Amino acid sequence: MSRDLRLLRTPEELRLQSERWRAAGLSVGLVPTMGALHEGHRSLVRRARAECDRVVASIFVNPTQFGPGEDLSRYPRSLEGDLAVLAEEGADAAFVPAVEAMYPEGAVTTVGLRGPLTEGFEGAARPGHFDGVATVVAKLLVAARPDTAYFGEKDAQQLAVVTRLAADLDTGARIVPCPLVRDADGLALSSRNAYLSPEERHQALAIPAGLAAAARAFAAGERDADRLVALVRDRLERSPRLAVEYVAVVDPDTFAELAEAARGCRIVVAGRMPSARLIDTLRLGFDAPPAVAVDATGAGEAAQRSNPAPGAAEWSRPCSVS
């Protein structure tokens, strides 16, 4: 459903628009993005559209979440196309601020979370990344005052950070996790996939193939985290161009690494191709094994069916860590 899209350029414009909606008794949904929108982003807007009276999506390549040597300068930007996507999906407004509007001269306040949630995995691989994420999300929540905000599960650690931030700061916003979306070949959708060469993309399919192997093993009764991780690594090691950064089974809320898997825990993966860094995740017992058309060795591994494996009804209790 296409509709007129209001363009907002400053936090003050966003705040005033949200106040008008709320004064009229309308619920507000926020979809934060960095642009280069794909089907995963579309799914977030659709979810917001279905649940909220008004939807605003932000398009902002946030410089504070990029570290030295990362891809800030070359991150894909396609504003005209992104605005068309938002209009097609029925968003009511797009918040497209300049860097100077979000971080005016003299601003010295940042937001950060301390502790294990932000120290491992992405926090270790990208120092300062989550401080940048937390700061920009806090600013968006303050300006938009949404009833709900929608985040994809692919960035699972970011989702956990944002959920904790929203609760700790008493923002009143409900953080809604939305399922990861995969391309037809099984690769998790990401704006950075545009960096991949055809050969790199082919080898990157080892990531969803590894997750599929672990999901099937879990469905068959495997609970030892080391053995599940080994199944994933076995697939990844078939891709000579993929440098593995981490594979782990974690609690989805705290990101504590687990020795024993249970239903609802996540397997998280990160690896680096010469042209792009890739992350992926799967919720054990909830997410169906990714359907992968061919493995990274070219050996023609049969496509994995997208239905849960036999035994799924007997998956164990939800994951929890005290």
Regions found by a protein language model. Give the residues of each.
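An anion-binding catalytic pocket shared by soluble metabolic enzymes
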Residues: 278
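Short beta-strand elements
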Residues: 260, 268-273, 282-284
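A short, polar/charged loop-to-alpha-helix boundary motif
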Residues: 199-201, 290-296
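Structural motif
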Residues: 54, 264-266
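Conserved beta-loop-beta connector loops within the AMP-binding
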Residues: 257-263
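Nucleotidyltransferase catalytic core that binds NTPs
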Residues: 2-243, 248-254, 282-285, 300, ...
